[in-house]
From Swiss-Prot:
Protein encoded by which gene: srb8
Main function: Component of the srb8-11 complex. The srb8-11 complex is a regulatory module of the Mediator complex which is itself involved in regulation of basal and activated RNA polymerase II-dependent transcription. The srb8-11 complex may be involved in the transcriptional repression of a subset of genes regulated by Mediator. It may inhibit the association of the Mediator complex with RNA polymerase II to form the holoenzyme complex.
Gene Ontology molecular function: any one: transcription coactivator activity
Keywords per UniProt: Activator, Nucleus, Repressor, Transcription, Transcription regulation
Annotated region (Disordered), positions in chain: 1-138, 156-288, 1592-1656, 1707-1727
The protein's name: Mediator of RNA polymerase II transcription subunit 12
GO biological process: positive regulation of transcription by RNA polymerase II
Compositionally skewed regions (Low complexity) per UniProt: 25-66, 81-98, 271-288, 1592-1628, 1647-1656, 1707-1716
Transmembrane regions: none
InterPro entries to which the protein is assigned, alphabetical: Mediator_Med12
Family the entry assigns: Belongs to the Mediator complex subunit 12 family.
Length: 1789
């Protein structure tokens, strides 16, 4: 059988079969021994020439490429797993795979047909199997002998073995006959085998030797070197090897087409038909293939020349061959019809109309006219087996969906659907198809059940969609967190992809799904957080695009980062922290608006700052911008200078009262305000004010000025300007200034030369009063400057100026020398022989210290400098003490040095001395150094040496412990100091633990006064008690309560016995109590508290001022326990700052039992007065007790206030009982100490101080005493009878006196009730409240509002009244369109109005922010605020020169619009004032009320209205922005304010705002309102309505302009194809007429009608406005009908407002005549339909017609669930989900 091979396949040559006798005889003549010898020689030659063999293999490949395809050895198949008839082509031992070239080895084995087997079957058959499957012999003997020696050496050995009897049995891998060798008698292969030709050595290639046969097999000698072969497989089944007919293979890339008129697989013409017939009978057997032909493919069909393509002629050679379809030629030309019209002036319009008609005819050709036959696949009930088969078919991509769409198994829905898709691994697109099919049927079920009730249908559909979304969410959670299942990763990937596709196609409730994603991320555990981050990142853009989800997402990430970063196992979560840090950094740069949330930002700002990488300027810049935006929403409403001063003063007070000064504090203060000069002045005022006690403020100011000097601040000029403008009267203020300048001069940032020049320019110093101690600071400073730190020239200039003023320089130097000599003598330093001071008795160090305190700043600095030089110079080593640098350095010498420095107040020099003295090895001295640092922690922190000194002492502690010296005092002092040093909490805990261990093992210090003879001092009975305690300590670490109670009672009884004696044995029993406390500190403290309460109730006892300090110093009594006795309940122990002053009832009950013993007054004195030197305490213990006193004042202010209240009540009760003997508060010293204590407590809690001082009694002397005390707190120089009024209090109020004025004001207002009760019925006396209101009015008019800081603590009624008054006056000052401001106001008046508005705003800000959370709830947005906000927008729109485009908010106009516009350039100034001043002020005002969370309906309405105004302002500012007005920053503030407002807005109010804005298109508004646009929400259908008969009659006339004029058409309307067809606008299609106008003639139109057409256009415009209002009224009535009519084409969801229209024609589809093209019409339905009119002179015009069709738009509901790709099994013309008729679709020709 011969056939024409396919294209591209090489034709095989006929096989040559012959057997040569000489060859056989020659081959048989070879002996077996010769063959073996040749084989061995060949193997040796191969080993020696390996490189030559590689070249031979390359030659073999080149020769094999020339090998003919008809060879007996076809290439093996490349498929390694194919196994046909024992032939394993994947066997690596197959040498043919290695010998044949790659191009032949890679061919498909089925494409090579052997001549011996033309059926195309595989030629690899075994020896014993015949051609047709019958058993046959193995062939001739010669064939059995022809084989290779080894499979690995098939073509390399020339040896021929003649023994045919040693044939091994055939196996799969060990067969000697190659599997690809043909079974028939083969020809002589010597001429054809390239392998044999190459492998035969040259010595065997003789001329007379014929071509040899293939090599024979070697002898059956077992070869042990050959690797073992696997066992043979079982015998394969027989295969049909009969020949098969030749089939034409169609090219896969050839395009196919459908053969018309053929349904049975037959038909067609030419070779394509034959090819289709051949294809139908091919192996595929598909009936669908027979209906299609292959384009441009005409294979040889057996008969030569039966196709025109095979006939070569001149035409075919030149132009080629193509199948031309029969086309009927045109018999008539259009030239005669169009040529006349084209020659006219309107020829271009005519040509466009002609083309429009041609396009219309072309569009209607083949247009789809069949009705929609769409129907979703039905659901049927199937058995489980069939259902499983159907689902498996769905998972098989080879099975088309049309086959599966015949029926959907019932019951596959919701969870089952998703699980089956996951388990069957259904492709994603097919899984989505199944979900659509099921969802469509579910939704149609709702429509059938709820027919007639559209509301219930919509509600049911929404509920079903939400339930389906919940199923998807549960599915994702179940798959994601099933970590133990197999193929977990693949399942997770599948779930992610499926959910993402469902989300992308809108097959779920997107809002609910996004909310679930964010909520899950917020509440997830750390172990699940990475998975939720992955899910959130899939929908990253959609989440961040909306405020509703973006803010929550950012907050969740920050919260997780904060928690993990603070976790104790943070090292485990390092990868997660890195991921969160990267995400947060990306979010801050990409979407910073999501971090604008004041409440969240204040909480997580510091944590977020830690995740910023170093050097990333973009992220740091974004962080700073976000911080600034949040500060605008949480900081004070008024950032003017008074507010900045308050902030600075508040920050400065913290570093001297609450916590030590941090290193970054100066930089923080620098950023408080941009007015740096005002900042410096406020800092100097704070440093020199008498209302801030202590020395720490001087060093804090010095540290800050040093830092600011590096920022290019001229400190010298700032200080000189301050001294010139500030009048300092109090000596305390002057000393602080002199001290500060002295430190600045020592640091080198205050230039003395510039100061001297400044004095000279002012006239110098001529009056002696100028340099006296009470002289002005600017001149007295010259005498206070330390001379030892000045240069020689500066010193000479200073002395010259002072001499001119009469200052005695020599006397001053002599006094300094005398002070130093007395100090040398007191310290025991050697003096000169003739020194008279050293000959006398030395002064006590305390007396010298008092004189130093009274000396000038220059004298103090000189003495401190001399003492430092003495210590550093080693002069103390040669003193009589011989102590410095040795182990025996006495604490007395150190105490003397410390006393001098404390008197001189030179702590900067003292810090250097302490650093030097830390080299001492005496632990007592080191402990005293630690105590000194503890007492002045704030001072050394300001000097930035606190941590350094602590580190040195801590290292010295380890050295002392290693030396074995008693380190307990140093350990105790360091443990107490470590708790005060910032950042040393862990070290403090370790030191306290070491101290407890040390106390247990060494209960008595070696250096203690009772360490050696404590037991000997006790009596016998007391010694037994001590031994019992020692045994308990040695035996264990615990003690039962009964035993402790017994021992405690025994020790306390003995302690009370020696109480009044003042014996040293009090210390012994105190030590026993301390050792007893080690067993159970908690129970011991309870026993001690009970004993203190017992002591409080004793009628007769000794003073507690001697016993309590001793017990505290020993360690068995704590200061909080003593303060607990100031409460009625002893459980208040350790309550800390949570305690408040007692009520009047509780106070009276306590003092009734204590007024006789003065217990409360003594306890108060214990915390105020220093311990007497006559007590049993050592100097070191007294110093440490003073530290505890100072620490209690700072850490327990409220407990001290309770104590003060009880002491005053006790004092009042005693005076009421006429018990005036030895009242502690009657002493003047105690009153001064109480005044200083109150001065400190007022700065911490002014309200608590006022409540503590509200003690009223029958004795008027106490009231006067309290009033005088509060007056002295405010006015330090006030006399006995000084009275301060409310107006004076408000005038004295500033940033520094504010707490003291607050106390005075509260005390004055609290007496109002008693004043009213005591008033008689006579003339009415104004109350204190009325007086205060009048004083506030005067103060606000004078623009003095510094007192507003104390308003929040007033009574709620008073603050509410004041806030309302300030709010009303603030709103009246705002400009508006209804009440425009006068254009004639000058700038000074405008500035005054702005200042008043700022003052009123500051009052409201202070009241609202100071009232706490409850106050925020009371101060909410009210409608009047929104009205004024609207007025500002109206005025801004009125002043804008171009029309505003604030959608949804336009149309506003005020009564003052004309007045504002008539001012010329004045309205530009007003507009600038609004944008720069008034609008920012009002935004601050709204910010105060935006933090409230009001869930009520009126509150949501007000917030919604405010948001609408914000939206209008955002759009308005975008329009105003330009070179004249930069509104970007202001627009950003409004945007941030809107974000804060919308965060607390209810969901229904948000939807109403979106509806009012009519689908906002601005990106910022979409973000604010979280509006997610549905791309299918605004689709519209365009309907054409037929005109009435009267309308047709009105529009049937035509008119023409006068001859010679140019025809025109309606402006704004371009002629073109229209979708609306009028009744009389059909264009005739007849041709052949010679008149060009008759081709487009409109029958029935006359010239009169043309003239009336223009008039009709004007009437049409008037009627359109009426039709619009009617259509709006009818639209709501038609929605019900439209929803029912469009159920087959629509979807679910609410009907949106029309915004996008699908230009669709519905009327012409039902007219029955599609031959008439429609006339052009615009898309706007409000415009009139236009009609083309043909003029008699050849022109054309478009005129509006009343009879033309009117367009009406109705919403089109796009049903996403019905968008199925294969809805039915039968292909229809119009079976798509959306009706093709809506798009005027055409069929493909």
């Amino acid at each position: 059988m011969t056939s024409r091979p396919p294209l591209g396949v090489q034709q095989r040559q006929p096989q040559q079969r012959k057997l040569s006798g000489p060859v056989l005889s020659q081959q048989r003549s070879l002996s077996q021994s010769q063959a073996q010898a040749q084989a061995q020689a060949q193997q040796q030659q191969q080993q020696q020439q390996q490189q030559q063999q590689q070249q031979q293999q390359q030659q073999q490949q080149q020769q094999q490429q020339q090998y003919d395809a008809s060879s007996y050895l076809p290439p093996p198949p490349p498929v390694p797993t194919r196994n046909n008839n024992h032939n394993n082509f994947s066997n690596p031992n197959n040498t043919l795979n290695n010998a044949f070239p790659p191009e032949l080895a890679q061919q498909d084995p089925t494409s090579i047909v052997s001549p011996a087997d033309p059926s195309g079957s595989s030629p690899a058959l075994s020896v014993g199997v015949g051609r047709y499957g019958t058993q046959r012999r193995g062939g001739s003997r010669l064939r059995l002998e022809l084989s290779h020696n080894d499979p690995f050496d098939a073509f390399s050995s020339p040896t021929v073995i003649e023994s045919p009897g040693l044939v091994e049995p055939h196996t799969q891998n060990g067969s000697l006959t190659h599997p690809m060798m043909p079974l028939a008698d083969g020809p002589d292969l010597g001429d054809m085998s390239p392998h044999h030709r190459v492998s035969i050595p040259p010595q065997h290639l003789d001329a007379d030797v014929p071509i040899p046969f293939p090599q024979r097999r070697p002898k059956a000698v077992p070869d042990h070197s050959r690797r073992e072969q696997p066992p043979p497989p079982p015998n394969p089944a027989r295969k049909d090897t009969r020949p098969k007919p030749y089939t034409i293979e169609l090219p896969a890339a050839a395009p196919r087409y459908r053969i018309r008129g053929r349904s049975d697989g037959q038909g067609g013409q030419g070779r394509s038909s034959a090819l289709a017939t051949a294809s139908s009978s091919s192996t595929t057997g598909s009936s669908a293939t027979a209906n299609y032909g292959c384009a441009d493919f005409f294979p040889w069909s057996g008969t030569a020349g039966n196709h025109p393509e095979d006939q070569f002629n001149d035409t075919a050679i030149r132009v080629g061959y193509s199948e031309k379809q029969f086309v009927t030629p045109e018999t008539q030309s259009a030239k005669t019809v169009l040529f006349h019209g084209l020659k006219q002036r309107s020829g271009l319009n005519a040509l466009s109309i002609f083309f429009a008609g041609v396009l219309w005819h072309r569009r209607n050709a083949g247009q789809v006219t069949a009705p929609s036959t769409f129907k979703p696949p039905p659901r049927v009930t199937l058995t489980d087996t069939k259902k499983e088969v159907w689902l498996k078919d769905l998972a098989n991509s080879a099975i088309p969906l049309r086959k599966l769409s015949r029926s959907i198994p019932h019951g596959v829905r919701n969870k089952v659907l998703l699980d089956q898709c996951l388990n069957k691994n259904v492709p994603i697109d097919r899984a989505v198809w199944l979900a659509k099919c099921v969802g469509t049927n579910e939704l149609r079920t709702f429509r059938r059940l709820g027919k007639g009730n559209n509301a219930s249908v919509l509600e049911g559909e929404r509920k079903w969609l939400k339930d389906w979304t919940l199923v998807i969410e549960n599915f994702i959670e179940r798959v994601f967190f099933s970590f133990g299942e197999q193929n977990w990763k693949a399942k997770v990937n599948y779930a992610i992809q499926l959910a993402a596709h469902l989300y992308a196609e809108g097959l779920m409730d997107r809002e609910h799904y996004l909310d679930w994603t964010v909520s899950s991320l917020e509440s997830s555990h750390h172990s699940q957080l990475p998975m939720w981050i992955i899910i959130a990142q899939i929908y990253w853009k959609d989440l961040l695009r909306l405020r509703k989800y973006g803010r929550r997402l950012a907050t969740a990430l920050i919260s997780h980062y904060h928690v993990i970063h603070a976790h104790e196992d943070r090292d485990i979560y390092v990868p997660l922290l890195s991921k969160l840090s990267h995400l947060l950094g990306t979010l801050m740069v990409a979407t910073p608006e999501n971090f604008v949330s004041p409440s969240v930002w204040v909480k997580y700002r510091d944590a977020l700052k830690t995740c910023l990488p170093q050097g990333d300027e973009a992220r740091h810049r974004s962080f700073a911008g976000i911080n600034y935006r949040n500060e605008q929403l949480v900081a004070s409403a008024n950032r003017s200078q008074p507010a900045a001063r308050i902030i600075l003063v508040r920050n400065l007070d913290q570093v001297i009262l609450e916590k030590p000064m941090p290193d970054e504090f100066p930089a923080q203060c620098w950023t408080v305000s941009k007015d740096k000069a005002a900042l410096v002045r406020a800092l100097l005022e704070w440093c020199t004010t008498p209302y801030r006690p202590g020395l720490a403020k001087v060093y804090v100011a010095h540290r800050i000025l040093m830092h600011w000097s590096t920022l290019r601040l001229d400190v010298t000029s700032a200080v000189l300007g301050f001294m010139e403008g500030e009048a300092l009267e109090e000596m305390e203020c002057k000393d602080a200034l002199y001290h500060l300048v002295s430190e600045l001069v020592r640091s080198g940032i205050f230039l003395v030369s510039q100061y001297i020049q400044w004095l000279i320019t002012r006239g110098g110093l001529t009056d002696p009063q100028l340099v006296m101690p009470d002289g002005p600071p600017f001149s007295r400073l010259l005498a206070e400057l330390p001379s030892h730190i000045l240069g020689s020239s500066q010193k000479r200039s200073r002395d010259a100026l002072l001499r001119r003023a009469g200052f005695r320089i020599a006397d001053d130097a002599q006094d300094a020398d005398m002070a130093i000599r007395h100090l040398r003598h007191a310290l025991g330093l050697p003096a000169g022989v003739t020194d008279a001071v050293s000959m006398g008795r030395p002064f006590p160090i305390k007396k010298i210290a008092r004189r130093i305190e009274d000396a000038s700043r220059a004298r103090k600095a000189e003495i401190a400098s001399w003492l430092r030089n003495t210590v550093f110079g080693g002069e103390l080593e040669h003193s009589s003490l011989n102590a410095f640098g040795q182990h025996d350095l006495s604490t007395r010498l150190f105490n003397s040095i410390r006393t001098v420095f404390e008197a001189a107040q030179e702590f900067s020099v003292f810090a250097d001395v302490l650093r030097m003295l830390t080299k001492c090895s005496n632990p007592e001295v080191l402990a005293s150094i630690a105590d000194t640092i503890t007492r002045y922690t704030f001072v050394f922190a300001a000097l930035s040496c606190l941590k350094n000194l602590f580190s040195i002492l801590h290292s010295r502690l380890r050295e002392v412990q290693e030396q074995g010296i008693g380190a307990r005092p140093l350990l105790a002092s360091l443990a107490y100091l470590a708790s005060r040093v910032p950042g040393m909490d862990e070290v403090a805990m370790q030191l306290k633990s070491d101290l407890a261990v040390s106390d247990r093992h060494n209960p008595v210090d070696a250096c203690s006064p009772v360490s050696d003879n404590m037991v000997s001092r006790l009596s016998d009975h007391d010694g037994d008690l001590h031994e019992e305690v020692e045994k308990l300590l040695a035996n264990g670490t615990s003690l039962d309560r009964n035993t402790m109670d017994r021992l405690f009672s025994a020790v306390i009884q003995r302690l009370q016995a020696y109480w009044s004696k003042g014996d040293e044995q009090q210390r012994v029993y105190g030590i026993l109590l301390k050792r007893l406390r080690m067993f159970n500190p908690q129970h011991f403290d309870e026993l001690m508290t009970r004993w203190l309460l017992y002591v409080r109730g004793l009628d007769t006892r000794a003073t507690i001022l001697h016993l309590y300090p001793l017990l505290v110093s020993i360690g068995c009594l704590e200061m909080p326990a003593i303060l607990a006795t100031a409460s009625e309940s002893p459980n208040a122990l350790g309550a800390g700052n949570s305690r408040h002053p007692q009520s009047a009832v509780a106070t009276s009950q306590i003092v009734q039992t204590t007024f006789r013993t003065r217990y409360m007054q003594e306890v108060l004195q214990l915390f105020m007065a220093p311990v007497s030197s006559e007590s049993l305490l050592t100097p070191e213990e007294r110093y440490r007790f003073g530290i505890l006193q100072e620490q209690a004042k700072k850490e327990s202010p409220r407990e001290l206030l309770c104590l003060i209240q009880l002491a005053l009540a006790e004092y009042t009760c005693a005076r009421a009982q006429n018990d005036l003997e030895e009242l502690p508060l009657d002493k003047e010293a105690n009153q001064d100490r109480l005044l200083r204590l109150l001065k400190l407590l007022v700065l911490k809690d002014p309200v608590g101080v006022a409540k503590a001082l509200q003690i009223r009694g029958p004795d008027a002397q106490i009231d006067g005493w309290i009033d005088r005390m509060t007056t002295k707190l405010l006015v330090t120089a006030a006399g006995e009878g000084t009275r301060v009024t409310f107006e004076q209090v408000l005038n004295l109020t500033n940033e520094f006196t504010l707490p003291f004025c607050h106390v005075k004001l509260l005390l004055s207002l609290s007496s109002n009730d008693q004043q009213q009760n005591a008033a008689d019925s006579g003339e009415r006396v104004p109350s204190n409240v009325e007086l205060f209101m009048n004083a506030m009015e005067k103060s606000m008019d004078a623009q003095r509002v510094s007192w507003i800081g104390m308003l929040p603590s007033l009574s709620p009624d008073l603050t509410h009244h004041l806030k309302n008054q300030a709010q009303a006056r603030f709103l009246n000052l705002l400009p508006s369109a209804r009440n425009p401001p006068s254009m004639t106001l000058d700038r000074s008046m405008l500035q005054m109005r702005l200042q008043k508005a700022e003052n009123f705003l500051a009052i409201m800000d202070t009241i609202i922010r100071g009232s706490g959370p409850m106050g925020f709830r009371q101060h909410q947005l009210v409608p009047v605020m929104v009205e004024r906000f609207t007025d500002i927008l109206e005025l801004l729109q009125t002043l804008t020169p171009f029309p505003s485009q604030a959608g949804g908010l336009g149309g506003w106009g005020g009564q003052g619009a004309s007045a504002a516009a008539a001012g010329g350039d004045s309205h530009i100034d007003l507009k600038s004032d609004i944008l720069n001043h008034w609008l920012p002020l009002f935004l601050n005002f709204l910010t105060l009320h935006a933090q409230t969370f009001d869930t009520s309906k009126p509150g949501n309405e007000v917030r919604g209205r405010a948001l609408m105004v914000c939206a209008g302002l955002i759009r308005e500012l975008d329009l105003i922005h330009g070179p004249d007005f930069d509104t970007r920053q202001l627009g950003g503030r409004i945007f941030d304010l809107a974000c804060v407002l919308v965060d607390n807005l209810a969901e229904d109010a948000r939807l109403q705002c979106i509806q009012a804005l009519k689908s906002p298109s601005d990106v910022k508004l979409r973000y604010i309102f979280s509006y997610q646009d549905n791309p299918h929400a605004n689709l519209m259908l365009c309907h054409k309505e037929r005109p009435t008969a009267m309308a047709i009659g009105t529009a049937t006339g035509t008119g023409s302009p006068a001859p010679g004029t140019t025809p025109t058409h309606t402006p704004g309307v371009t002629p073109g194809p229209q979708n609306a067809v009028g009744a009389g606008s059909a264009v005739s299609g007849a041709g052949g007429s010679g008149n060009g106008g008759s081709y487009f003639s409109l029958p029935g139109h006359t010239q009169q009608a043309q003239a009336q057409g223009w008039h009709a256009a004007q009437q049409q415009q008037q009627q359109q406005q009426q039709q619009q209002s009617q259509q709006q009224q009818q639209q709501q009535q038609q929605q019900q009908y439209q929803l029912q009519q469009q159920q087959q084409q629509g979807g679910t969801g609410p009907i949106p407002s029309p915004a996008i229209s699908i230009n669709t024609n519905l009327t012409h589809l039902n007219l029955g005549n599609n031959s008439n093209p429609p006339t052009p019409s615009p898309m706007n339905p409000t415009r009139p339909a236009m009609m083309m009119v043909a003029n008699p002179w050849g022109g054309y015009s478009w005129v509006p017609t009343m009879g033309g069709p009117q367009e009406r738009l109705t919403p089109f509901n796009f049903r996403q669930w019905e968008m199925l790709s294969e809805p039915t099994s039968q292909v229809g013309e119009n079976d798509t989900a959306v009706n093709l008729m809506l798009f005027e679709s055409r069929k493909v020709q």
